[in-house]
Every structure is written in C-alpha cells, then in structure tokens.
C-alpha cells in the first residue's frame, strides 16, 4: 500500500513511532495492511484502505474563510472526539481528518465508500491520546470543550 513518508525530525519520528507501534492490528472488521513506505509513521486498514499518516504538515487556522492548502477556514467546525480535536476536510473520493491539538499531526484518510467517516477516524483517537502529547500553544479555540 503506497503512502507518502516525509522525512521527520527526531522528535516527530519518536512520536510517530510511538503512535504506529500502538495502533491496533485491526479496526472493526478491517485488518491492518502492509505499507510500502514509512511503516514507522504510516498504517493502512482494509480495502479500500483507510490510511493513518503521522508527521505531515500541521494545518493552521487562517484569516480567510476560503481556506487553501494547509489552511483551515475560520468558520470550520472542528470535531472533538475522545479528547482529540480533528479537522475534517471532506472530499469526493475521501474525507481527511487531521489532528489540530497534538504535538505531531496525525492524518486519517477515510475513502468515501465508508459511511460515517468521522466514526472511522475516531477509531484512532485513543491511540493518539496515549502516544502524541497535546500541544500547549497554538491550539484553535474550537478544540476546547
């Protein structure tokens, strides 16, 4: 399963290794799949694959409502699920969920063939809480309960 594996700094690599080492061997009825790049920062489940990528760019809240690459529009509703704040970027082929409140960003891509995409992303929240520390600064106000 091809998944991008950007070069990580030492701290991000340490956090991502902690995240991936604690991921389950299956989520619901979807078994883990082998990834071809960066198994210490990536994972995949099922067919079509739900992917988990650790260490990508951290999206930022932007002063524009239009958004853009790496930019979360100010009027976006963030999802607080199991103590993790997720930004959900809907797409026609997949929904992409990215943590907004963690030291290292974790992105979960859920193909549109799966119903209730947020619930699939939430399958990884407990692992994120246990392995990826909360950021102390720069957390969007929408991430607070």
Language model features with spans:
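Extracytoplasmic low-complexity, Pro/Thr/Ser/Ala/Gly-rich segments
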Residues: 1-51, 56, 144-145
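Extracytosolic low-complexity repeat regions of secreted or lipid-anchored proteins
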Residues: 59, 63-145
């Amino acid at each position: 399963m091809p998944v991008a594996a950007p070069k990580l700094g030492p701290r991000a690599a340490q956090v991502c290794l902690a995240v991936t080492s604690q991921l389950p061997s299956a989520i619901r009825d979807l078994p883990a799949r082998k990834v071809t790049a960066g198994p210490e920062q990536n994972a995949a489940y099922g067919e079509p694959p739900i992917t988990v990528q650790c260490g990508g760019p951290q999206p930022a809240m932007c002063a524009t409502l239009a958004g853009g690459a790496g930019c979360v529009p100010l009027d976006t509703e963030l999802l607080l699920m199991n103590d993790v704040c997720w930004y959900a970027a809907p797409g026609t082929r997949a929904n992409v969920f990215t943590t907004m409140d963690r030291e290292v960003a974790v992105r979960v891509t859920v193909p549109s063939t799966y119903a209730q995409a947020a619930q699939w992303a939430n399958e990884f929240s407990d692992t994120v809480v246990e392995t990826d520390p909360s950021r102390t600064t720069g957390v969007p106000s929408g991430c607070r309960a």
